[in-house]
């Protein structure tokens, strides 16, 4: 019994050992297979990473090559541009050099011609001097013979006869002297006239400028006809707000493709034009938005005036100049006289005056400075309403400008005599610039003066802040200060302005006077959570 149990136990033990061996073998196979699989997976991942790295490197190489090609192309383009620019500069410099050489040759020929003429005149004078000496000897001989004859036949003493002959000779010599003086004066005037014509002709031939006249309207294209409704606004609130803040008339074309801004004041029209362009581009057109954009554009334009003046000073090579004068030069861009832009006219005068002064032996730089500043007072006439000559003299004296500049401001309107070559050059250049065909339009200037006169009448009254002449002078819109004028005073001011216009105006028609008084209160609400 016990031996049988032992046998069974041995069998069980052997079976367990065999099972354990089998399990060990199977597990070993499984772990080996898993290891192989993991190894293959790691190898595949390594190959994938290697492939990705290689692809990335190749892509980077392609990108770098593309970038290199692009940079190379940019370098070549820039090099080509610089080369073209320098070639143009070189051609321009050669052209200037050729012009200078031609000018020097012309001057040399002119001087040689003058020298020959002077030598010829000197020889003539020498010949006349010799002839005069010979005639004097002949006269003395004739005088002696006549004296002897008269002493023989007349009852005069020798001294009396001598005095008679001397008086007669003196009268004859005085007559000859007067004739010679008149002849030389005539020749000098003719020669001076020819030379002045030659100088003016050469100055105008060497000057090349842009000739442009100012219109009284500005046209702005509309993206589509729907914008007409946006600009007008509900019940016309937008267009009324725009007219009120800008003082500019606005009209629409028949085909609704554009609108037209009309004002004699170039600066006011420029601000209004830029404001309307921004509003149309943005699409948000509301009364508050209109006022906000208008004031922002006005501030930006004021800042640009100094930059504009500095550009003109650099262009004309005038050297140092006070900032106030530069700002006033920039402001002249928005002023006109008889339809001619004031800044363009002043630049023309400066360039022409420099050329003329150079020909006459004057200071070219000083003549240019006097030319650009001769109408500087026009930048202040719309604000101060006084004569531009006196305004220009005041501002130039305040900044201690050269007396030649002051003399040019006075002399170009005949308030003073011309005291220098530079001043004469400015006066001649001013006449050339203003007198050329098509430079000025008298009708436009008369219209602008009529509009400005209406605004000046309104601004004379106490409490008036702004005044805008609109609708071609048929309407005068006046804005009064709410802290100085009460509501019951508004009709009285309107009637007074209308009466003053009736007394002052010299043209037929009606002018509607609209006086506006407005109070605004602004506060800020703070929101708390």
Curated annotation (Swiss-Prot):
Membrane topology: Single-pass membrane protein
GO molecular function: RNA binding; RNA endonuclease activity
Subcellular compartments: Cell membrane
Example of a GO biological process term: mRNA catabolic process
Gene3D superfamilies linked to this entry: 3.30.310.210, Hypothetical protein af1432 (1.10.3210.10)
SUPFAM superfamilies: Eukaryotic type KH-domain (KH-domain type I), HD-domain/PDEase-like
Pfam family, one: KH_1
Entry function: Endoribonuclease that initiates mRNA decay.
Protein name: Ribonuclease Y
Gene: rny
